[in-house]
Amino acid sequence: MHFTLQQLKLFEAVSRNNSYTRAAEELHLTQPAVSIQIKRLEEQCGLPIFESVSKKIFTTAAGKALYDASLDILNRAEELKNTIEELKGVVKGPLRLSVVTTSKYFMPHLLGTFLNQYPEVEPKMVFTNRARVIQRLYDNEDDFVVMGQTPEDDKLETYPFLENILVPVAHPDHPLAKKKKITLKELVKERFLVREEGSGTRLVFDRLLEKNEFKVEPYMELGSSEAIKQGVMAGLGLAILSLHSLRLEQDAKKLVVLDVEGFPIKRRWFAVHMKGKKLSLVAQTFHDFILAESNNILGFNKK
Protein backbone atom coordinates (compact mmCIF):
# COMPACT_ATOMS: atom_id res chain seq x y z
CA MET A 1 0.00 0.00 0.00
CA HIS A 2 1.23 3.48 -0.89
CA PHE A 3 -0.36 6.37 0.99
CA THR A 4 0.59 10.03 0.79
CA LEU A 5 0.62 12.31 3.83
CA GLN A 6 -1.97 14.48 2.09
CA GLN A 7 -4.32 11.51 1.74
CA LEU A 8 -3.89 10.67 5.42
CA LYS A 9 -4.58 14.29 6.39
CA LEU A 10 -7.77 14.24 4.33
CA PHE A 11 -8.84 10.93 5.81
CA GLU A 12 -8.16 12.12 9.37
CA ALA A 13 -10.23 15.28 8.80
CA VAL A 14 -13.17 13.36 7.29
CA SER A 15 -13.08 10.80 10.13
CA ARG A 16 -12.90 13.44 12.85
CA ASN A 17 -15.70 15.54 11.35
CA ASN A 18 -17.81 12.60 10.09
CA SER A 19 -18.33 14.77 7.04
CA TYR A 20 -16.73 15.27 3.63
CA THR A 21 -18.08 18.81 3.48
CA ARG A 22 -16.68 19.96 6.84
CA ALA A 23 -13.34 18.30 6.10
CA ALA A 24 -13.16 20.08 2.74
CA GLU A 25 -13.95 23.44 4.37
CA GLU A 26 -11.35 22.87 7.09
CA LEU A 27 -8.63 22.03 4.55
CA HIS A 28 -9.72 24.68 2.01
CA LEU A 29 -10.46 22.12 -0.69
CA THR A 30 -13.51 21.27 -2.77
CA GLN A 31 -15.68 18.36 -1.68
CA PRO A 32 -15.11 16.46 -4.98
CA ALA A 33 -11.33 16.72 -4.47
CA VAL A 34 -11.67 15.19 -1.01
CA SER A 35 -13.99 12.44 -2.26
CA ILE A 36 -11.56 11.48 -5.05
CA GLN A 37 -8.64 11.14 -2.63
CA ILE A 38 -10.70 9.08 -0.17
CA LYS A 39 -11.78 6.79 -3.01
CA ARG A 40 -8.12 6.27 -4.00
CA LEU A 41 -7.30 5.53 -0.37
CA GLU A 42 -10.01 2.86 -0.26
CA GLU A 43 -8.62 1.34 -3.44
CA GLN A 44 -5.20 1.14 -1.81
CA CYS A 45 -6.70 -0.53 1.27
CA GLY A 46 -8.83 -2.94 -0.71
CA LEU A 47 -11.59 -2.45 1.87
CA PRO A 48 -14.21 0.24 2.50
CA ILE A 49 -13.05 2.72 5.15
CA PHE A 50 -16.35 4.60 5.45
CA GLU A 51 -19.97 3.51 5.46
CA SER A 52 -23.06 5.65 5.05
CA VAL A 53 -25.98 5.17 7.46
CA SER A 54 -29.03 7.45 7.25
CA LYS A 55 -27.04 10.03 5.29
CA LYS A 56 -24.29 10.04 7.93
CA ILE A 57 -20.82 8.60 7.43
CA PHE A 58 -18.97 6.39 9.90
CA THR A 59 -15.59 4.66 9.83
CA THR A 60 -15.60 0.90 9.28
CA ALA A 61 -13.34 -1.49 11.20
CA ALA A 62 -10.69 -0.97 8.51
CA GLY A 63 -11.25 2.78 8.74
CA LYS A 64 -10.74 2.79 12.51
CA ALA A 65 -7.47 0.89 12.16
CA LEU A 66 -6.37 3.31 9.45
CA TYR A 67 -7.38 6.29 11.60
CA ASP A 68 -5.20 5.19 14.53
CA ALA A 69 -2.27 4.58 12.20
CA SER A 70 -2.84 7.91 10.45
CA LEU A 71 -2.69 9.85 13.71
CA ASP A 72 0.60 8.18 14.60
CA ILE A 73 2.12 8.81 11.16
CA LEU A 74 0.96 12.44 11.00
CA ASN A 75 2.22 13.15 14.52
CA ARG A 76 5.60 11.61 13.70
CA ALA A 77 5.80 13.63 10.49
CA GLU A 78 5.05 16.82 12.43
CA GLU A 79 7.68 15.92 15.03
CA LEU A 80 10.24 15.32 12.28
CA LYS A 81 9.42 18.66 10.68
CA ASN A 82 9.81 20.43 14.03
CA THR A 83 13.08 18.63 14.78
CA ILE A 84 14.54 19.73 11.46
CA GLU A 85 13.48 23.34 12.10
CA GLU A 86 15.04 23.17 15.57
CA LEU A 87 18.31 21.86 14.15
CA LYS A 88 18.29 24.89 11.87
CA GLY A 89 17.70 27.10 14.92
CA VAL A 90 14.48 28.49 13.42
CA VAL A 91 11.65 29.46 15.79
CA LYS A 92 8.90 28.20 13.54
CA GLY A 93 5.98 25.81 13.78
CA PRO A 94 3.10 24.96 16.12
CA LEU A 95 2.65 26.29 19.64
CA ARG A 96 -0.07 24.52 21.66
CA LEU A 97 -1.31 26.11 24.87
CA SER A 98 -4.20 25.67 27.28
CA VAL A 99 -4.91 28.54 29.65
CA VAL A 100 -7.57 29.19 32.28
CA THR A 101 -10.29 31.61 31.22
CA THR A 102 -9.25 34.49 33.49
CA SER A 103 -5.88 34.65 31.74
CA LYS A 104 -7.67 35.87 28.61
CA TYR A 105 -7.12 39.38 29.98
CA PHE A 106 -3.35 39.15 29.48
CA MET A 107 -2.29 36.01 27.54
CA PRO A 108 -3.42 37.35 24.11
CA HIS A 109 -1.28 40.46 24.69
CA LEU A 110 1.77 38.34 25.54
CA LEU A 111 1.18 36.04 22.57
CA GLY A 112 0.67 38.98 20.20
CA THR A 113 3.98 40.57 21.21
CA PHE A 114 5.73 37.22 20.84
CA LEU A 115 4.28 36.66 17.36
CA ASN A 116 5.53 40.08 16.27
CA GLN A 117 9.02 38.75 16.95
CA TYR A 118 8.40 35.24 15.62
CA PRO A 119 5.78 35.52 12.85
CA GLU A 120 6.27 31.94 11.61
CA VAL A 121 4.96 30.45 14.85
CA GLU A 122 1.52 28.82 14.44
CA PRO A 123 -0.33 29.29 17.76
CA LYS A 124 -3.29 27.39 19.13
CA MET A 125 -4.48 28.70 22.48
CA VAL A 126 -7.42 27.00 24.22
CA PHE A 127 -9.24 29.02 26.91
CA THR A 128 -11.12 26.77 29.31
CA ASN A 129 -11.81 26.19 33.00
CA ARG A 130 -9.20 24.97 35.46
CA ALA A 131 -10.47 21.39 35.57
CA ARG A 132 -10.20 21.04 31.78
CA VAL A 133 -6.75 22.67 31.74
CA ILE A 134 -5.57 20.14 34.31
CA GLN A 135 -7.02 17.27 32.27
CA ARG A 136 -5.25 18.51 29.14
CA LEU A 137 -2.03 18.87 31.14
CA TYR A 138 -2.08 15.23 32.25
CA ASP A 139 -3.16 14.05 28.80
CA ASN A 140 -0.15 15.89 27.31
CA GLU A 141 -2.34 17.74 24.79
CA ASP A 142 -0.33 20.96 24.96
CA ASP A 143 3.24 22.22 25.09
CA PHE A 144 2.45 23.74 28.47
CA VAL A 145 -0.51 25.28 30.30
CA VAL A 146 -1.12 28.50 32.23
CA MET A 147 -3.07 28.59 35.50
CA GLY A 148 -3.16 30.28 38.87
CA GLN A 149 -3.91 27.38 41.21
CA THR A 150 -1.60 24.48 40.34
CA PRO A 151 -2.26 20.89 41.45
CA GLU A 152 -0.11 19.64 44.33
CA ASP A 153 1.88 17.10 42.35
CA ASP A 154 5.65 16.57 42.37
CA LYS A 155 5.41 15.24 38.80
CA LEU A 156 4.81 18.80 37.59
CA GLU A 157 7.21 21.62 36.76
CA THR A 158 5.70 24.99 37.73
CA TYR A 159 7.18 28.36 36.77
CA PRO A 160 5.75 31.57 38.30
CA PHE A 161 5.79 34.46 35.86
CA LEU A 162 3.19 37.07 36.85
CA GLU A 163 1.43 38.25 39.99
CA ASN A 164 -2.27 37.40 40.26
CA ILE A 165 -4.01 39.76 42.67
CA LEU A 166 -7.49 38.79 43.87
CA VAL A 167 -9.79 41.50 45.24
CA PRO A 168 -13.40 41.87 46.44
CA VAL A 169 -15.50 44.05 44.12
CA ALA A 170 -18.89 45.77 44.33
CA HIS A 171 -21.18 48.15 42.46
CA PRO A 172 -20.18 51.78 43.21
CA ASP A 173 -23.54 52.35 44.94
CA HIS A 174 -23.20 49.36 47.26
CA PRO A 175 -23.32 50.30 50.99
CA LEU A 176 -19.78 48.93 51.49
CA ALA A 177 -18.30 50.74 48.50
CA LYS A 178 -17.05 53.78 50.45
CA LYS A 179 -16.41 52.06 53.77
CA LYS A 180 -12.85 51.62 55.04
CA LYS A 181 -11.39 48.60 56.82
CA ILE A 182 -14.30 46.24 56.26
CA THR A 183 -13.97 43.10 58.34
CA LEU A 184 -14.28 39.65 56.83
CA LYS A 185 -17.21 39.06 59.20
CA GLU A 186 -19.04 42.00 57.61
CA LEU A 187 -18.14 40.89 54.10
CA VAL A 188 -19.51 37.35 54.40
CA LYS A 189 -22.96 38.68 55.30
CA GLU A 190 -23.34 39.93 51.71
CA ARG A 191 -24.61 38.05 48.64
CA PHE A 192 -21.81 36.57 46.55
CA LEU A 193 -21.53 35.72 42.88
CA VAL A 194 -18.98 32.95 42.41
CA ARG A 195 -17.36 30.81 39.73
CA GLU A 196 -18.07 27.10 39.45
CA GLU A 197 -16.45 24.71 41.93
CA GLY A 198 -12.87 23.89 40.96
CA SER A 199 -12.09 27.28 39.43
CA GLY A 200 -8.99 29.04 40.74
CA THR A 201 -10.67 32.10 42.26
CA ARG A 202 -13.36 29.93 43.86
CA LEU A 203 -10.68 27.73 45.46
CA VAL A 204 -8.84 30.72 46.92
CA PHE A 205 -12.02 32.26 48.35
CA ASP A 206 -13.23 28.93 49.78
CA ARG A 207 -9.86 28.40 51.49
CA LEU A 208 -9.93 31.91 52.97
CA LEU A 209 -13.39 31.28 54.40
CA GLU A 210 -12.40 27.87 55.75
CA LYS A 211 -9.24 29.28 57.36
CA ASN A 212 -11.32 31.92 59.16
CA GLU A 213 -14.17 29.50 59.95
CA PHE A 214 -16.76 31.32 57.86
CA LYS A 215 -19.29 29.80 55.51
CA VAL A 216 -20.91 31.56 52.55
CA GLU A 217 -23.79 30.12 50.54
CA PRO A 218 -23.27 31.47 46.99
CA TYR A 219 -26.12 33.62 45.75
CA MET A 220 -25.33 32.77 42.13
CA GLU A 221 -22.81 30.44 40.49
CA LEU A 222 -21.64 31.66 37.07
CA GLY A 223 -19.34 30.19 34.45
CA SER A 224 -17.05 33.12 33.67
CA SER A 225 -15.50 36.25 35.13
CA GLU A 226 -17.36 38.30 32.50
CA ALA A 227 -20.72 36.97 33.67
CA ILE A 228 -19.79 37.68 37.28
CA LYS A 229 -18.73 41.26 36.46
CA GLN A 230 -22.03 41.87 34.68
CA GLY A 231 -23.88 40.52 37.71
CA VAL A 232 -21.98 42.77 40.12
CA MET A 233 -22.56 45.80 37.86
CA ALA A 234 -26.27 44.93 37.90
CA GLY A 235 -26.23 45.08 41.69
CA LEU A 236 -26.80 41.35 42.22
CA GLY A 237 -24.02 40.96 44.77
CA LEU A 238 -20.29 41.04 45.47
CA ALA A 239 -17.51 38.94 43.97
CA ILE A 240 -13.85 38.02 44.30
CA LEU A 241 -12.04 38.61 41.01
CA SER A 242 -8.56 38.89 39.56
CA LEU A 243 -7.38 42.48 39.27
CA HIS A 244 -6.30 41.63 35.71
CA SER A 245 -9.95 41.37 34.72
CA LEU A 246 -11.05 44.75 36.11
CA ARG A 247 -9.13 47.43 34.22
CA LEU A 248 -11.94 48.56 31.92
CA GLU A 249 -14.63 48.50 34.61
CA GLN A 250 -12.45 50.39 37.10
CA ASP A 251 -11.54 53.04 34.53
CA ALA A 252 -15.24 53.46 33.70
CA LYS A 253 -16.10 53.55 37.43
CA LYS A 254 -18.57 50.70 37.00
CA LEU A 255 -16.94 48.55 39.70
CA VAL A 256 -15.02 49.40 42.86
CA VAL A 257 -12.50 47.38 44.83
CA LEU A 258 -13.51 47.07 48.49
CA ASP A 259 -11.16 47.77 51.40
CA VAL A 260 -11.41 44.44 53.25
CA GLU A 261 -9.11 42.87 55.83
CA GLY A 262 -7.10 39.99 54.39
CA PHE A 263 -7.22 41.48 50.88
CA PRO A 264 -5.78 41.76 48.35
CA ILE A 265 -4.80 38.11 48.11
CA LYS A 266 -1.57 37.90 46.16
CA ARG A 267 -1.05 34.75 44.13
CA ARG A 268 0.96 33.94 41.03
CA TRP A 269 0.29 32.83 37.48
CA PHE A 270 2.25 29.73 36.49
CA ALA A 271 3.46 28.08 33.31
CA VAL A 272 3.12 24.34 33.96
CA HIS A 273 4.15 21.13 32.23
CA MET A 274 4.93 17.55 33.21
CA LYS A 275 8.36 16.98 34.75
CA GLY A 276 10.80 15.61 32.18
CA LYS A 277 8.82 16.96 29.21
CA LYS A 278 11.12 18.27 26.47
CA LEU A 279 9.65 21.44 25.05
CA SER A 280 9.99 22.17 21.35
CA LEU A 281 12.13 25.14 20.38
CA VAL A 282 8.96 27.19 19.77
CA ALA A 283 7.43 26.26 23.13
CA GLN A 284 10.68 26.80 25.04
CA THR A 285 11.16 30.19 23.40
CA PHE A 286 7.63 31.32 24.33
CA HIS A 287 8.03 29.83 27.82
CA ASP A 288 11.24 31.83 28.39
CA PHE A 289 9.62 34.90 26.83
CA ILE A 290 6.66 35.07 29.23
CA LEU A 291 8.88 34.41 32.26
CA ALA A 292 11.22 37.25 31.29
CA GLU A 293 8.94 39.82 29.66
CA SER A 294 5.40 39.57 31.10
CA ASN A 295 5.68 42.39 33.62
CA ASN A 296 7.31 44.76 31.13
CA ILE A 297 4.81 44.06 28.33
CA LEU A 298 1.76 44.38 30.57
CA GLY A 299 3.08 47.50 32.29
CA PHE A 300 3.26 46.10 35.82
CA ASN A 301 6.77 47.44 36.35
CA LYS A 302 5.62 51.00 35.71
CA LYS A 303 5.29 53.25 38.72
Regions found by a protein language model. Give the residues of each.
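Short beta-strand-centered segments that line the small-molecule binding cleft or hinge
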Residues: 2-3, 68, 109-113, 131-170, ...
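A late-sequence structural motif
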Residues: 256-300
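Secondary-structure junction motif
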Residues: 177, 191-212, 243, 279-283, ...
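Short helix-boundary/capping micro-motifs
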Residues: 12-28
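N-terminal winged-helix
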Residues: 31, 82, 88-118, 122-126, ...
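Hydrophobic hinge/microswitch elements
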Residues: 129-134, 138-141, 147-148, 206-256
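Flexible hinge/capping segments at coil-to-helix
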Residues: 88-89, 155-192
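A short LG(V/I)-centered, amphipathic sequence patch enriched
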Residues: 42-61
